[in-house]
């Protein structure tokens, strides 16, 4: 959409789409992933198939993929009753695991795998089907392992099988939990509350989110992309512009920070400002950790506005060929902070 072409992959994107679609508390921007969201909705059919047989479509073939069923089966805890609903091979009813994963080589020998636990345990039907097909030591090993586990299973006639959803406190399915679980394992490299709970506009939050990932189009990042760029920092005529240099190390940026931190009375943060930070993320987390808990949201808002206006000043110098002094940039930051306070009536 932004590129204007039918396909815009790779270097056209500041942040990859997989990161953008993560929930905010998992390091993403919270833009819905339609594929994952669609899967979460389809899982609702599988849930309803278990818990509500009165649905008009109950018993019909559901438009769910193998991946949908795999996610669903790993998301439920089955409590066996009479075994009439639970699939012997596909559901995780045996020590919380599905027999097809406990005995994968045996599973490959079978042609009919959709029978229920009740059907297969009756008269040990599952054993009779496999007895004539076992041909190797691995088959025997898996057969014996499965047989030993099944000895502890006792069906309860007249009591239906029930399921519990793993990802909610009340054990019931929710679309939100089904969506979020698909992002489990995403690595979080930054305390996202520092951005998303700050008292600043969304455009500034999104900029800060891009900044902490070192994806804003500084001279260094433009150089990596093969684009035109300044060879020196336009703020101080120093080294090649990086996110870290522009926002924290550049003498111009340091002077702006000193004015803002003095004005906001963050004296303990000014000492941190004199250190040599190695990354914006680690610097930000360190100064937030040193601030009193009651002051952290305000500090985060001040930090984002400062980053934002340093970036805007950099762009003025490059694209508009005009510049402002340190006091002028600091005044813009103070004005935004004061307007935000008045708009939301907080101090």
Language-model segments: which ranges?
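A helix-boundary/hinge signal
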Residues: 1-347
């Amino acid at each position: 959409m932004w590129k204007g072409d039918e396909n815009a992959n790779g270097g056209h994107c500041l942040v990859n789409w997989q990161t953008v679609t993560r929930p905010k508390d998992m390091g993403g921007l919270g833009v819905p992933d339609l594929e994952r969201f669609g899967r979460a909705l389809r899982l609702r059919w599988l849930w309803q198939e278990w818990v509500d047989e009165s649905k008009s479509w109950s018993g019909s073939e559901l438009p769910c993929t193998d991946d949908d069923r795999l996610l669903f089966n790993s998301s439920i805890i089955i409590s066996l009753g009479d075994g009439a609903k639970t699939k012997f091979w596909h559901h995780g009813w045996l020590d919380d695991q599905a027999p097809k994963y406990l005995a994968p080589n045996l599973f490959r020998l079978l042609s009919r795998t959709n029978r229920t636990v009740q059907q297969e345990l009756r008269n040990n039907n599952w054993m009779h089907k496999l007895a004539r097909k076992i041909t190797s030591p691995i088959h025997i090993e898996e057969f014996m392992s499965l047989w030993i586990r099944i000895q502890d299973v006792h069906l309860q006639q007249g009591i239906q099988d029930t399921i519990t959803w793993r990802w909610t406190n009340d054990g019931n399915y929710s679309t939100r939990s089904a969506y979020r679980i698909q992002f489990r394992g995403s690595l979080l490299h930054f305390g996202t509350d520092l951005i998303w709970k700050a008292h600043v506009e969304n455009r500034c939050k999104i900029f800060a989110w891009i900044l902490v990932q070192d994806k804003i189009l500084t001279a260094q990042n433009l150089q990596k992309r093969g684009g035109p760029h300044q060879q020196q920092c336009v703020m101080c005529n120093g080294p090649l512009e990086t996110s870290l240099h522009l926002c924290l190390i550049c003498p111009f940026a340091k002077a702006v920070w000193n004015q803002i931190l003095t004005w906001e009375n963050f004296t303990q943060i000014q000492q941190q400002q004199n250190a040599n930070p190695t990354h914006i993320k680690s610097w930000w987390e360190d100064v937030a950790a040193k601030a009193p808990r009651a002051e952290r949201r305000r500090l985060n808002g001040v930090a984002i506005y400062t980053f934002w206006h340093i970036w805007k000043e950099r762009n003025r110098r490059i694209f508009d060929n005009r510049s402002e002094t340190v006091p002028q940039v600091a005044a813009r930051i103070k004005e935004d902070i004061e307007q935000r306070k008045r708009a939301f009536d907080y101090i």
